[in-house]
Design a protein with these regions (language model features):
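N-terminal [4Fe-4S]-dependent radical SAM core
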Residues: 144-220
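Glycine-rich beta-alpha loop elements in corrinoid/cobalamin-binding modules
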Residues: 1-170, 177
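Low-complexity, intrinsically disordered regions enriched in charged/polar residues
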Residues: 105, 183-186, 263-266
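Conserved Radical SAM active-site core
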Residues: 2-49, 54, 60-63, 68-79, ...
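Short coil/turn linker and secondary-structure boundary residues
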Residues: 90, 183-187, 247, 255
Length: 280
Protein backbone atom coordinates (compact mmCIF):
# COMPACT_ATOMS: atom_id res chain seq x y z
CA UNK A 1 0.00 0.00 0.00
CA UNK A 2 2.15 2.83 -1.34
CA UNK A 3 1.29 6.30 -2.58
CA UNK A 4 2.37 6.40 -6.23
CA UNK A 5 3.87 9.90 -5.98
CA UNK A 6 5.90 9.08 -2.87
CA UNK A 7 6.90 5.90 -4.65
CA UNK A 8 8.16 7.82 -7.69
CA UNK A 9 9.71 10.98 -6.26
CA UNK A 10 12.05 12.01 -3.48
CA UNK A 11 11.19 14.85 -1.09
CA UNK A 12 13.22 17.13 -3.37
CA UNK A 13 10.96 16.12 -6.28
CA UNK A 14 13.65 14.14 -8.08
CA UNK A 15 12.51 11.03 -9.90
CA UNK A 16 13.60 7.85 -8.15
CA UNK A 17 15.72 5.47 -10.24
CA UNK A 18 14.40 2.28 -8.67
CA UNK A 19 11.05 1.02 -7.40
CA UNK A 20 11.28 -1.42 -4.51
CA UNK A 21 7.61 -2.33 -4.92
CA UNK A 22 7.97 -3.57 -8.51
CA UNK A 23 9.41 -6.94 -9.62
CA UNK A 24 13.13 -6.59 -10.06
CA UNK A 25 13.07 -3.10 -8.57
CA UNK A 26 12.48 -1.58 -12.01
CA UNK A 27 11.15 1.96 -12.12
CA UNK A 28 8.40 3.12 -14.46
CA UNK A 29 5.84 0.32 -14.32
CA UNK A 30 2.98 2.36 -12.86
CA UNK A 31 1.72 5.87 -13.61
CA UNK A 32 1.89 8.94 -11.44
CA UNK A 33 -1.32 9.40 -9.44
CA UNK A 34 -2.19 5.78 -10.11
CA UNK A 35 -5.63 5.91 -8.46
CA UNK A 36 -6.76 8.70 -10.77
CA UNK A 37 -5.30 7.13 -13.90
CA UNK A 38 -6.62 3.63 -13.25
CA UNK A 39 -10.02 4.90 -12.13
CA UNK A 40 -10.53 6.84 -15.36
CA UNK A 41 -9.32 3.95 -17.52
CA UNK A 42 -11.77 1.60 -15.82
CA UNK A 43 -14.58 4.12 -16.28
CA UNK A 44 -13.79 4.47 -19.99
CA UNK A 45 -13.73 0.70 -20.49
CA UNK A 46 -16.53 -0.41 -18.15
CA UNK A 47 -18.84 2.59 -18.04
CA UNK A 48 -21.42 1.10 -15.67
CA UNK A 49 -19.10 -0.78 -13.33
CA UNK A 50 -19.12 0.30 -9.68
CA UNK A 51 -15.67 1.73 -8.91
CA UNK A 52 -14.55 1.67 -5.28
CA UNK A 53 -11.18 3.22 -4.45
CA UNK A 54 -9.19 3.05 -1.23
CA UNK A 55 -5.73 2.67 0.23
CA UNK A 56 -3.31 5.34 1.33
CA UNK A 57 -3.31 7.32 -1.94
CA UNK A 58 -7.08 7.70 -2.00
CA UNK A 59 -7.52 8.01 1.75
CA UNK A 60 -5.21 11.01 2.11
CA UNK A 61 -6.81 12.74 -0.88
CA UNK A 62 -10.43 12.14 0.05
CA UNK A 63 -11.21 15.86 0.30
CA UNK A 64 -9.59 18.92 -1.28
CA UNK A 65 -5.88 18.77 -0.53
CA UNK A 66 -2.60 20.55 -1.15
CA UNK A 67 -0.52 18.74 -3.76
CA UNK A 68 3.15 19.11 -2.89
CA UNK A 69 4.32 17.90 -6.29
CA UNK A 70 2.43 20.53 -8.28
CA UNK A 71 2.36 23.14 -5.50
CA UNK A 72 -1.37 23.65 -5.91
CA UNK A 73 -4.73 22.80 -4.40
CA UNK A 74 -6.43 19.76 -5.89
CA UNK A 75 -9.98 18.46 -5.68
CA UNK A 76 -11.06 15.32 -3.91
CA UNK A 77 -9.59 12.33 -5.73
CA UNK A 78 -13.11 10.89 -5.75
CA UNK A 79 -14.04 13.49 -8.37
CA UNK A 80 -10.87 13.27 -10.44
CA UNK A 81 -10.76 9.46 -10.52
CA UNK A 82 -14.35 8.94 -11.63
CA UNK A 83 -14.94 6.54 -8.74
CA UNK A 84 -18.31 6.00 -7.09
CA UNK A 85 -17.16 5.46 -3.51
CA UNK A 86 -13.91 6.17 -1.69
CA UNK A 87 -13.00 4.10 1.36
CA UNK A 88 -10.78 5.97 3.78
CA UNK A 89 -8.82 4.51 6.63
CA UNK A 90 -8.01 0.82 6.88
CA UNK A 91 -11.36 -0.21 5.43
CA UNK A 92 -12.05 -3.73 6.70
CA UNK A 93 -15.59 -2.94 7.85
CA UNK A 94 -16.46 -0.66 4.95
CA UNK A 95 -15.36 -2.97 2.15
CA UNK A 96 -17.43 -5.85 3.53
CA UNK A 97 -20.51 -3.64 3.92
CA UNK A 98 -20.13 -2.33 0.36
CA UNK A 99 -19.74 -5.86 -1.00
CA UNK A 100 -22.85 -6.98 0.89
CA UNK A 101 -24.83 -4.02 -0.45
CA UNK A 102 -23.79 -4.65 -4.05
CA UNK A 103 -24.47 -8.38 -3.65
CA UNK A 104 -27.97 -7.53 -2.45
CA UNK A 105 -28.59 -5.58 -5.66
CA UNK A 106 -28.39 -2.07 -4.24
CA UNK A 107 -27.30 0.47 -6.89
CA UNK A 108 -23.92 1.95 -6.09
CA UNK A 109 -25.32 5.49 -6.02
CA UNK A 110 -27.55 4.45 -3.11
CA UNK A 111 -24.68 3.15 -0.98
CA UNK A 112 -24.30 6.40 0.92
CA UNK A 113 -24.74 5.24 4.50
CA UNK A 114 -21.52 3.35 5.26
CA UNK A 115 -19.11 4.81 7.78
CA UNK A 116 -15.55 5.19 6.59
CA UNK A 117 -16.62 6.12 3.06
CA UNK A 118 -16.83 9.23 0.90
CA UNK A 119 -19.32 9.76 -1.92
CA UNK A 120 -20.51 12.56 -4.20
CA UNK A 121 -24.03 13.92 -4.51
CA UNK A 122 -25.83 16.68 -6.35
CA UNK A 123 -28.14 17.56 -3.46
CA UNK A 124 -28.01 17.73 0.32
CA UNK A 125 -31.73 17.05 0.72
CA UNK A 126 -31.07 13.54 2.06
CA UNK A 127 -27.80 14.27 3.88
CA UNK A 128 -28.32 14.76 7.60
CA UNK A 129 -26.35 15.85 10.65
CA UNK A 130 -23.33 17.21 8.82
CA UNK A 131 -20.74 19.92 9.30
CA UNK A 132 -20.26 22.13 6.26
CA UNK A 133 -16.63 22.65 5.29
CA UNK A 134 -15.40 25.67 3.30
CA UNK A 135 -16.27 25.34 -0.37
CA UNK A 136 -13.75 24.65 -3.11
CA UNK A 137 -13.92 28.30 -4.16
CA UNK A 138 -13.33 29.47 -0.58
CA UNK A 139 -10.39 27.10 -0.20
CA UNK A 140 -8.82 28.34 -3.43
CA UNK A 141 -9.30 31.97 -2.40
CA UNK A 142 -7.73 31.89 1.07
CA UNK A 143 -5.13 29.60 2.64
CA UNK A 144 -6.65 30.24 6.07
CA UNK A 145 -9.86 28.60 4.89
CA UNK A 146 -7.83 25.54 3.95
CA UNK A 147 -6.24 25.49 7.40
CA UNK A 148 -9.66 25.80 9.04
CA UNK A 149 -11.05 23.00 6.89
CA UNK A 150 -8.21 20.64 7.72
CA UNK A 151 -8.56 21.41 11.42
CA UNK A 152 -12.22 20.40 11.29
CA UNK A 153 -11.26 17.21 9.48
CA UNK A 154 -8.63 16.39 12.10
CA UNK A 155 -11.14 16.91 14.89
CA UNK A 156 -13.55 14.44 13.31
CA UNK A 157 -11.30 11.38 13.04
CA UNK A 158 -12.85 9.66 16.06
CA UNK A 159 -15.44 6.98 15.21
CA UNK A 160 -17.44 7.84 18.34
CA UNK A 161 -17.62 11.63 18.10
CA UNK A 162 -16.75 12.22 14.44
CA UNK A 163 -19.31 14.08 12.35
CA UNK A 164 -20.32 13.74 8.74
CA UNK A 165 -18.49 16.40 6.67
CA UNK A 166 -19.62 18.05 3.44
CA UNK A 167 -17.32 19.87 1.01
CA UNK A 168 -19.17 21.92 -1.66
CA UNK A 169 -17.89 22.27 -5.22
CA UNK A 170 -19.18 24.36 -8.15
CA UNK A 171 -22.24 23.27 -10.12
CA UNK A 172 -24.04 21.80 -7.10
CA UNK A 173 -21.52 19.03 -6.50
CA UNK A 174 -20.99 17.96 -2.90
CA UNK A 175 -18.39 15.53 -1.59
CA UNK A 176 -19.71 13.87 1.57
CA UNK A 177 -17.40 12.19 4.06
CA UNK A 178 -19.27 9.86 6.40
CA UNK A 179 -17.99 9.48 9.98
CA UNK A 180 -14.99 7.18 10.45
CA UNK A 181 -15.54 3.44 10.51
CA UNK A 182 -15.54 1.69 13.87
CA UNK A 183 -12.14 0.57 15.07
CA UNK A 184 -11.32 -3.13 15.10
CA UNK A 185 -11.57 -5.04 18.34
CA UNK A 186 -8.62 -7.15 19.46
CA UNK A 187 -10.42 -10.27 18.21
CA UNK A 188 -10.95 -8.62 14.82
CA UNK A 189 -7.32 -7.49 14.68
CA UNK A 190 -6.29 -11.09 15.36
CA UNK A 191 -8.64 -12.42 12.71
CA UNK A 192 -7.35 -10.04 10.03
CA UNK A 193 -3.71 -10.75 10.88
CA UNK A 194 -4.17 -14.52 10.88
CA UNK A 195 -5.89 -14.96 7.54
CA UNK A 196 -4.09 -17.57 5.38
CA UNK A 197 -1.89 -15.15 3.47
CA UNK A 198 0.57 -16.53 0.91
CA UNK A 199 3.34 -14.46 2.55
CA UNK A 200 5.28 -14.30 -0.70
CA UNK A 201 5.23 -12.48 -4.01
CA UNK A 202 3.41 -13.99 -6.98
CA UNK A 203 5.40 -16.76 -8.69
CA UNK A 204 5.29 -14.78 -11.94
CA UNK A 205 7.74 -12.35 -10.33
CA UNK A 206 10.40 -14.98 -9.65
CA UNK A 207 12.11 -14.49 -13.00
CA UNK A 208 12.68 -10.79 -12.22
CA UNK A 209 14.13 -11.60 -8.82
CA UNK A 210 11.01 -10.93 -6.78
CA UNK A 211 9.86 -7.70 -5.14
CA UNK A 212 12.71 -6.00 -3.21
CA UNK A 213 10.50 -4.31 -0.61
CA UNK A 214 9.20 -7.66 0.56
CA UNK A 215 12.55 -8.53 2.10
CA UNK A 216 12.11 -5.69 4.61
CA UNK A 217 8.81 -6.97 5.99
CA UNK A 218 8.85 -10.73 5.39
CA UNK A 219 9.95 -11.47 8.95
CA UNK A 220 8.21 -8.55 10.65
CA UNK A 221 5.02 -8.63 12.69
CA UNK A 222 2.41 -5.86 12.89
CA UNK A 223 1.10 -5.70 16.43
CA UNK A 224 -1.01 -2.54 16.44
CA UNK A 225 -2.39 0.35 14.42
CA UNK A 226 -3.62 3.90 15.04
CA UNK A 227 -1.82 6.90 16.51
CA UNK A 228 -2.87 9.69 18.84
CA UNK A 229 0.28 11.72 18.17
CA UNK A 230 -0.99 13.97 15.35
CA UNK A 231 2.61 14.94 14.50
CA UNK A 232 2.66 17.63 11.82
CA UNK A 233 5.12 15.66 9.68
CA UNK A 234 3.08 12.45 9.61
CA UNK A 235 -0.21 11.52 7.95
CA UNK A 236 -0.79 8.35 9.95
CA UNK A 237 -3.51 9.72 12.23
CA UNK A 238 -5.37 10.99 9.17
CA UNK A 239 -5.37 7.47 7.71
CA UNK A 240 -5.54 5.03 10.63
CA UNK A 241 -7.19 7.30 13.18
CA UNK A 242 -6.04 8.20 16.66
CA UNK A 243 -7.44 5.18 18.50
CA UNK A 244 -4.86 2.50 19.29
CA UNK A 245 -5.91 -0.97 18.16
CA UNK A 246 -3.87 -3.95 19.28
CA UNK A 247 -3.56 -7.64 18.61
CA UNK A 248 -3.50 -10.13 21.45
CA UNK A 249 -0.24 -11.55 22.76
CA UNK A 250 -1.34 -15.05 21.77
CA UNK A 251 -2.00 -13.98 18.18
CA UNK A 252 1.43 -12.37 17.89
CA UNK A 253 3.06 -15.51 19.26
CA UNK A 254 1.17 -17.68 16.76
CA UNK A 255 2.44 -15.54 13.89
CA UNK A 256 5.98 -15.66 15.26
CA UNK A 257 5.80 -19.45 15.36
CA UNK A 258 4.48 -19.45 11.79
CA UNK A 259 7.44 -17.35 10.62
CA UNK A 260 9.89 -19.86 12.06
CA UNK A 261 8.57 -22.50 9.66
CA UNK A 262 9.64 -20.50 6.60
CA UNK A 263 12.64 -22.14 4.89
CA UNK A 264 14.34 -18.72 4.67
CA UNK A 265 13.96 -17.93 8.37
CA UNK A 266 17.38 -17.22 9.88
CA UNK A 267 16.53 -17.18 13.56
CA UNK A 268 15.38 -13.63 14.18
CA UNK A 269 12.29 -11.48 13.64
CA UNK A 270 13.14 -8.03 12.27
CA UNK A 271 10.43 -6.08 14.03
CA UNK A 272 7.32 -6.43 16.16
CA UNK A 273 5.36 -3.22 16.34
CA UNK A 274 3.51 -0.58 14.40
CA UNK A 275 2.72 3.11 14.76
CA UNK A 276 3.02 4.41 18.33
CA UNK A 277 4.27 1.01 19.45
CA UNK A 278 5.70 2.47 22.63
CA UNK A 279 2.29 3.84 23.60
CA UNK A 280 0.42 0.57 23.25
Amino acid sequence: NMDSMVNHYSVTKHRRHTDAYTPGGEEGHRPNRAVTVYGNLIRQTFKDAPIIIGGIEASLRRLAHYDYWQDKLKRSVLLDSGADILIYGMGEHAIVEIADALDAGLPVDQITYINGTVYRTGSLDEVYDYDLLPSWDDLAADKLNYARSFNVQQQNMDPITGHRLVEPYPNSVYVVQNPPSATLTTDEMDEVAELPYARDWHPDYDAAGGVPAFAEIKFSISSNRGCFGECSFCALTFHQGRVLQMRSHDSIMREAELLTRDPEFKGYINDVGGPTANFS
